[in-house]
Regions:
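Catalytic domains that recognize anionic headgroups
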Residues: 1-291
């Protein structure tokens, strides 16, 4: 299975007609914006190469805007704004990891796209399995627990911890469609409520990240794979989610938390990994709105 993020150029006219029928003008323009951002941004913009930064632990929040941490982050460090190399998780992983030999690094990820990365990139990969009946819900506590296990098993490796929050579904809402907050905001125009809910969802992962910083030794960098549009306008129409070629999506935070102690890091050849089934990954990606 390989991720499919868009359609061929020759398919666009037919898809546009289909979108107009099913989603109206607003929904169609939203899809056009995402198509452009997902398929062209990463080809024309470099963005940061986070693997070349000096860190022992890299914490990635999924869909965390730069202004989210600037206004509400509780990390005791300066927050920079940097440009992500992509506006979508899979493009981000391709740009940051694919073709690399990061054999001094272990990846712990709740994002299902990590399941598609080649076996020879990292020393080890821990794909976090949803621990909830709703396959789109990934509890950040579970990610932290897996990360601590990974650190115990591989103490001399750099560690990447990829939380799914503040990406939808918002954990405070049970048994609701992942995009329900966006749908409601489109209908009511209440963007302040949406942002407040977004912050609340972020807190779940931030609390875990703060615990990780206390628990593990080494220099920690906190960032995001991409940001999130929360009603900002493109062509006069409010956009929601990610994929869009907009500052709210491609600008991400970068926070460096220093440490007095650093672990000794050295590379070793990759070890066998357990892959999740294609059916489960497809179900997760669809539930998260990626497909």
């Amino acid at each position: 299975m390989s991720p499919s993020l868009g359609v061929q150029v020759t398919e666009v006219p037919g898809r546009l007609v289909q979108h107009l029928r099913n989603n109206g003008v607003y929904g169609t323009i939203d899809q056009i914006s995402k198509y452009i951002g997902i398929n062209y941004y990463h080809r024309l913009v470099d963005g940061i190469d986070i693997t070349k930064y000096d860190w022992d632990v890299l914490i990635i929040f999924d869909a965390a805007r730069a202004d989210l941490l600037e206004m509400f982050g509780r990390f005791d460090a300066e927050i920079e704004r940097v440009r992500s190399p992509a506006t979508h998780s899979w493009r981000y992983m391709q740009r940051q990891y694919s073709g690399r030999r990061l054999h001094d690094t272990v990846l712990v990820s709740a994002n299902p796209y990590a399941n598609e990365l080649a076996d020879d990139i990292f020393h080890a990969v821990y794909q976090v399995i949803p621990d909830h009946e709703e396959v789109a819900r990934s509890e950040p506590q579970t990610v932290t627990e897996q990360a601590l296990v990974a650190n115990q098993e591989h103490p001399n490796k750099r560690l990447i911890i990829h939380y799914m929050q503040p990406h939808t579904p918002y954990l405070q809402f049970k048994n609701k469609a992942p995009d329900e907050p966006f749908t409601r905001a489109r209908q009511t125009g209440d963007l302040d409520q949406l942002y407040s809910e977004y912050v609340e969802n972020y807190r779940y992962a931030e609390n875990e990240a703060l615990d990780v910083i206390e628990e593990l030794e080494g220099r920690v960098i906190i960032t995001a794979d991409h940001g999130e549009a929360l009603g900002e306008r493109w062509l006069g129409i409010p956009m929601f989610g990610h994929g869009h070629w907009m500052p709210e999506v491609y600008e991400v935070p970068l926070v460096t938390v220093e440490s007095d102690t650093r672990p000794g890091i050295f590379p070793e050849k990759p070890i066998a990994r357990i892959r999740l089934s294609d059916d489960l990954i497809n179900e997760q990606l669809e539930a998260l709105g990626y497909r």
